[in-house]
Amino acid sequence: MNILIALIPALGWGIFSLIAGKIKNSHPANELMGLGTGALIIGIITAIIHPASSNITIFSLSLISGMFCALGQSGQFISMRNIGISKTMPLSTGFQLIGNTLIGAIIFGEWTSSSQYLIGTLALILIIVGVSLTAISKDKSAKLKMRDIILLLFTSIGYWIYSSFPKAITANAQTLFLPQMIGIFIGSIIFLLVSRQTKVLKEKATWLNIFSGFSYGIAAFSYIFSAQLNGVITAFIYSQLCVIISTLGGIFFIGENKTKSELIATFVGLILIIIGAAIQ
């Protein structure tokens, strides 16, 4: 049952990027605002069905972690439009894996034996090699630029904080979830204000992206449970199987072009990701 719960975030986080990518005339500001709104709605519904008590400290910290999540998501949406879903997601996954694995192993002490370090390191190597293979491109115009890498690396800090937060405090999932979704919504508003794109609130694409927010919100709720049941490292690695859904979806559903050799590299990379997640 714990593993099934760990796989729900992979499904939700894999699908939401495809929903956003399929909406016409959609831009990062539309996508982030729509996601924030949809996630907030899921948070409110969850709070009504499963009300949970909290205190000002836990509520405030949860809200801040949600705002950091919005930072991470803004980088993903911008990169998706610049270099495509099938390149963004593997690279983003790699950065997140490195950060969250180090946080889980060093700060939370989830690796306590030499065998755990050995197996965990092997799993991490397989997954990083896998995501690197999925990002291979022979088209010079489509190759990653340093600015794309720096953007994703910087914004991934938001994901590191958000992903590790459920393990940092003692509270149940229901207590954490609503304030985190409020934080994502507030973070989305801040993004619009800072980038001076408040006009997107009137655009159809923003409201259609609420459906991607529904998918994201369900995944986020499941992730909180998974992190508490399975530990940060295991929960995160399983959740990042979303890269399989988003990468293949970007190619076959969105229609992002890849040559035969690039497809082979992508499939090999995805297999390595699955193996790495399975042995973790």
Swiss-Prot record:
GO terms for cellular component: plasma membrane. The chain crosses the membrane at residues 4-21, 33-52, 56-78, 91-113, 117-136, 149-166, 176-195, 207-229, 233-255, 262-279. It is a multi-pass membrane protein. Pfam families: Sugar_transport. InterPro entries: Sugar_transport (IPR010651). It is found in: Cell membrane. Keywords: Cell membrane, Membrane, Sugar transport, Transmembrane, Transmembrane helix, Transport. One of its GO terms (molecular function) is carbohydrate transmembrane transporter activity. SUPFAM superfamilies: Multidrug resistance efflux transporter EmrE (SSF103481). Its main location: membrane. CDD domains: GRP. Belongs to the GRP transporter (TC 2.A.7.5) family. This is Putative sugar uptake protein. It comes from Lactobacillus helveticus.
